[in-house]
Swiss-Prot record:
InterPro entries: AB_hydrolase_1, AB_hydrolase_fold, HAT_MetX-like. One of its GO terms (cellular component) is cytoplasm. This is Homoserine O-succinyltransferase. Disulfide bonds: none annotated. It comes from the Bacteria. It comes from Pseudomonas fluorescens (strain SBW25). The keyword Cytoplasm applies. It is found in: Cytoplasm. One of its GO terms (biological process) is homoserine metabolic process. The record marks R325 as: Important for acyl-CoA specificity. Homodimer. Belongs to the AB hydrolase superfamily. MetX family.
Length: 379
């Protein structure tokens, strides 16, 4: 519990809400007549608005990327190791914007929001979203903030996909793109993992076809299982072996199916329980579908190099050796396409045992490489 914030912290931050009354047309063919986006900012926008950086979050992320909401808050924002004075995304230099995406469950309009047409939660009636839909909504937020062009758009995992989409959809509005632990599209295996997670939610009796809020319940079991499956894919075999091995919770085996016997079982159950108490099931379905649908090359004859021909940004691609969810091979595929499109791109593969979640962890070589690239950005 901090009584004084570290000197490299952005300190206390206050979330802000932006309301948009102009309808937003969506890829699914529907539209949202109006919507809200909750966001936070760190640092100061300079006179020419040339120092703005957009942070795009991953599947379960949100707007609170850095700093603290109160002096009593135990943990800072989810990317606090990378955002702040003297950190890779240096708030002495950059004005940083972090939002909760449309369809989220942390303040932006999403399935748990009230539908103005009937006064009930949207639930399963909330439209299916794509990465491109998010980028369009983010562009409107940029307009509201007076930002014509981002100095950089940065994201890890699903956030990296949004950063890439920015360079395709709004090529003149982003100067640098940093895609970390990401991929140009999901593999069949990744789609399969997402489907298992969705089925865990959809088949939970408490899901009620997505109208669980009206029923006054939560599909806790389904969300818990979905998170447990997902969390396994975010870690590496080495990191799980080092952290848990075959360690037992007690001194002996119980020879039953109900006891939590292994430490790794206890860890996964804790992660699932904690997640199911704070995340919306319909939002989880939306986020995984947006992941599945992301395939920008599909609009360019499946030619990834052609996809980026119109991009004007400079690119930085980073991957982690033990990430098997978005493996280094997928990042190299992206780098090869960018090089074929004659784009300015640098690539770094970090040797790290933490798996996919490594992009969230303050690994010294990763932070140093991140800082080196950001220091090169001129305003």
């Amino acid at each position: 519990m901090p009584t004084a914030f570290p000197p490299d912290s952005v300190g206390l931050v206050v979330p802000q809400m932006a309301h948009f009354s102009e309808p937003l047309a969506l890829a699914c063919g529907r539209s949202l007549p109006a919507y809200d986006l909750i966001y936070e900012t760190y640092g100061q926008l300079n006179a020419t608005a040339s120092n703005a950086v957009l942070i795009c979050h991953a599947l379960s992320g949100h707007h609170h990327a850095a700093g603290f909401h109160s002096v009593d808050e135990r943990k800072p924002g989810w990317w606090d190791s990378c955002i702040g004075p003297g950190k890779p995304i240096d708030t002495n230099k950059f004005f940083v914007v972090s939002l909760n995406n449309l369809g989220g469950c942390n303040g932006s309009t999403g399935p748990s929001s009230l539908n103005p047409e009937n006064g009930k939660p949207f639930g399963a009636d909330f439209p299916v979203l794509t990465v491109e839909d998010w980028v369009h909504s983010q562009a409107r937020l940029a307009d509201l903030l007076g930002i014509d062009q981002w100095a950089a758009v940065i994201g890890g995992s699903l956030g990296g996909m949004q950063a890439l989409q920015w360079t395709i959809t709004y090529p003149d509005r982003v100067r640098h793109c940093l895609a970390i632990a990401s991929a140009p599209k999901l593999s069949a295996q990744n789609i399969a993992f997402n489907e298992v997670a969705r089925q865990a939610i959809l088949t939970d009796p408490e899901f009620h076809g997505g109208s669980f809020q009206e029923a006054g319940v939560i599909p806790k079991r389904g969300l818990m299982l979905a998170r447990m499956v997902g969390h396994i894919t975010y870690l590496s075999d080495d990191s799980m072996g080092e952290k848990f091995g075959r360690g037992l919770k007690s001194e002996k085996l119980n020879y039953d199916f109900h006891s939590v016997e292994f430490q790794v079982e206890s860890y996964l159950r804790y992660q699932g329980e904690e997640f199911s108490g704070r995340f919306d099931a319909n939002t989880y379905l939306l986020m995984t579908k947006a992941l599945d649908y992301f395939d920008p090359a599909a609009n360019f004859d499946d030619d990834l190099a052609k996809t980026f021909e119109g991009a004007t940004a400079k690119f930085c691609v980073m991957s982690f050796t033990t990430d098997w969810r978005f493996s280094p091979a997928r990042s190299r595929e992206l780098v090869d396409a960018l090089m074929a499109a004659r784009k300015d791109v640098c690539y770094l593969e970090i040797d790290a045992p933490q798996g996919h979640d490594a992009f969230l962890i303050p690994i010294p070589r990763y932070l140093q490489a991140f800082s080196n690239y950001m220091n090169r950005i001129t305003l």
